[in-house]
Amino acid sequence: LYMIPALMGMLLTLICGFLPALNVVSEKEVGTIEQINVTPVPKFTFILAKLLPYWITGFIVLTLCFLLAWLLYGITPVGHFIVIYFLAILFVFVMSGFGLVISNYSATMQQSMFVMFFFMLILMMMSGLFTPVSSMPEWAQVITYFNPLKYFMEGMRMVYLKGSSLLELLSEIGVLFLFALGFNTWAVISYRKNQ
């Protein structure tokens, strides 16, 4: 019961962070991104078009996870699905922005894969997925404050286990919003610089 909501967060991290980064870098390698850049399509529209399929896929996978958790384990959230999906929307924005930042600084797919894999390991190990944050050393607990996955997992567990409302999740929502704003702004700025 404690792990199921966290595993959903891990899947969203992989789908909405890892895959968009690889997609944009593959466009660079093939050379099609140069053709797209000379078209009158705004950069925001291009980035949105790249991310939208992964957002939709992420929400489909999240919905399937809810269904499987109910069918296989009989686990349903105590709180509302609307709260979970709201948290998921914020987290998807965070991870897709993070993936785009990595792709903007990567020249090849191998480079972006290694960098994303490195950060994914840190995000997962320092999020409280396997080890509760309270049982980590003090220096590790400090690092977790800069981990968006930690806030998403805490929010998911609070909704799943306690039935928390949006008002009770204001701190998690606020931090995820700041991460989303920061990463996506950085992604747009760094994309323009590279062009």
State the predicted function of each range.
Residues 4-20:
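Long, hydrophobic alpha-helical segments
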Residues 17-39, 195:
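Transmembrane helix boundary and interhelical loop/hinge segments in multi-pass membrane proteins
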Residues 18-22, 66, 70, 100, ...:
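Transmembrane alpha-helix boundary and packing residues in multipass membrane permease domains
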Residues 27-28, 104-105, 159:
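Helix-to-coil boundary motifs at intracellular loop junctions of multi-pass secondary transporters
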Residues 37, 41, 106, 131, ...:
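Short helix-loop-helix connector
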Residues 43, 47-124, 167-173, 177, ...:
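Alpha-helical transmembrane segments and their short interhelical loops
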Residues 76, 127-182:
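Membrane-interfacial helix-loop-helix junctions in multi-pass membrane proteins
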Residues 188-195:
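Short cytosolic juxtamembrane segments of multi-pass membrane proteins
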